[in-house]
Amino acid sequence: MTKKKEVLREIGMIARCLDSISNVEFQHLNLSRGQYLYLYRICENPGIIPNQLAELIKVDRTTAARAISKLEADGFVVKQSAMGNKKNKLLYPTDDGLEAWDFIRREGVHSDQVTLEGLTEEEIETAVHLLRRMRHNIEVDWKFVKKGGRRPYMDQSE
């Protein structure tokens, strides 16, 4: 296996491990799979609009809308019309949402400690720097495909 493939496989495995743990540990909060991501970002950014939230989490608007509707129905967030633009709905956490967020943040701190165990500050800085560069690289394609574009490999014959 090439080192290039190993990088994304390792990132994927780390992400799936953390997501799986979170989904189990957040069951008592009555959060459905992956909803904690949305709630966390809404609590971090009170008043965020759904399109900005979708962009922040890197999901399509329809997926974000479903998750937001479920969070709203379950009493974790509320939507309010923006002043001067009634179409824009601002998202705010409820008291229940803030209470859940407190638990989610504690899990995040613990997961950070476990995941980064044995790494020096310099290694962590290097990892963050490299991962940001990788994200910036793929965001170009993500935005292009999101707007209906086709990446070049799709037009090549096998």
Residue ranges and their predicted role:
Residues 4, 60-61, 90-93, 147-158:
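Membrane-interacting alpha-helical segments
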Residues 11-14, 18-21, 57, 100, ...:
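Alpha-helical linker/hinge and terminal dimerization helices associated
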Residues 11, 39-42, 131:
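Hydrophobic structural patches
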Residues 69-132:
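Charged, amphipathic alpha-helical coiled-coil/dimerization segments
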Residues 16, 20-63, 146:
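N-terminal helix-turn-helix DNA-binding core of bacterial DNA-binding proteins
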Residues 1-29, 157-158:
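N-terminal leader segment of winged-helix/HTH proteins
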Residues 121-158:
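C-terminal regulatory/oligomerization modules of transcriptional regulators
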